[in-house]
Curated annotation (Swiss-Prot):
Superkingdom as given in the UniProt entry: Eukaryota
Protein name (Swiss-Prot/TrEMBL): Transmembrane protein 163
Quaternary context: Homodimer. Interacts with MCOLN1. Interacts with SLC30A1, SLC30A2, SLC30A3 and SLC30A4.
Swiss-Prot/TrEMBL keywords: Cell membrane, Cytoplasmic vesicle, Endosome, Lysosome, Membrane, Phosphoprotein, Synapse, Transmembrane, Transmembrane helix, Transport, Zinc
Gene expressing this chain: Tmem163
UniProt-annotated stretches for the region Required for interaction with MCOLN1: 41-71
Record SUPFAM superfamilies: Cation efflux protein transmembrane domain-like (SSF161111)
Chief location category: membrane
Length: 288
């Protein structure tokens, strides 16, 4: 009977009976380890946000590398064609208006010895040419988002800007050196008012369309119209100042020099920006 008792003493306790802790030690209550999931999720979210930010910064560059403008992602096909037609209508209107103003301004320049009128006439001719380039730019309905076609138009505009600015500055400097005095009459007043108002309205329309179509050519054409509006008002300003104070005879020529230098600087900036892009996108002919 005793061996049986010994065997009962050696039998281990059941799993449901806990063992007492050793003396001198407090019972350990192990707290569950914090889950690393929130930290890892926050790290992942930061890592996901980082490439998104960099991708958004390089988004337009990626489109240009594929031969497309940013308007290809902003506008639906029917919206792009609608704005393209509006750009064509505005360009035709600009050609008609500025051509008439150019003839009138050249007449004023010859009859009244006005450097500003000559400068405006040259700028009006430039506006006619730039609007014709915009017509070519949007003549192809399938190329409304073509980056290469856009940049070629801008390069041509840059060259025209340089040539016209040289002519304006040379004419203005010649008038300043020979001390040509402008004459004031109702014809000069009418031309300056009409050119200032009409060119300013055309500039606003071109800026709005250029922003929607993300077209640097349209924005450049709008800048040229804005310069034409400023020159139209400058004719009125210089004529009125000379009428009340003949000592300020140089104001007309000085404005002509300033406007010529402004056009020259814009043309140089345009060529610096656009010539490399023409080379980058010349192999792409991706149209809608």
């Amino acid at each position: 009977m005793e061996p049986a008792l010994g065997s009962e003493r050696r039998s281990p306790p059941g799993p449901g009976v806990p063992r007492p802790p050793p003396r001198g030690h407090a019972p350990s209550t192990a707290a569950p380890a914090p889950s690393p999931a929130p930290m890892s999720s926050s790290v992942q979210s930061d890592e996901e946000r980082q490439p998104r930010i960099s991708e958004s910064g390089q988004f337009s560059d990626g489109l240009e590398d594929r031969g497309l403008l940013e308007s290809s992602t902003r506008l639906k096909p029917h919206e792009a064609q609608n704005y393209r037609k509006k750009a064509l209508w505005v360009s035709w209107l600009s050609i008609i208006v500025t051509l008439a103003l150019a003839v009138a301004a050249f007449t004023v320049s010859v009859m009244r010895y006005s450097a500003s009128a000559f400068g405006f006439a040259f700028d009006a001719i430039l506006d006619v040419l730039s609007s014709a380039i915009v017509l070519w730019r949007y003549s192809n309905a399938a190329a409304v988002h073509s980056a290469n076609r856009e940049y070629i138009a801008c390069v041509i505009l840059g060259v025209i800007f340089l040539l016209s600015s040289i002519c304006i500055v040379v004419k203005a400097i010649h008038d300043l050196s020979t001390r040509l005095l402008p004459e004031v009459d109702d014809f000069l007043f009418s031309v300056s008012i009409l050119s200032g108002i009409l060119c300013s309205v055309l500039a606003v329309l071109k800026f709005m369309l250029g922003k929607v179509l993300t077209s640097r050519a349209l924005i450049t054409d709008g800048f040229n119209s804005l310069v034409g509006g400023v020159m139209g008002f400058s004719i009125l300003l210089s004529a009125e100042v000379f009428k009340h104070n003949a000592a300020v005879w140089y104001l007309d020529g000085s404005i002509g020099v300033l406007i010529g230098l402004t056009i020259f600087a814009y043309g140089v900036k345009l060529l610096i920006d656009m010539v490399p892009r023409v080379r980058q996108t010349r192999h792409y002919e991706m149209f809608e």
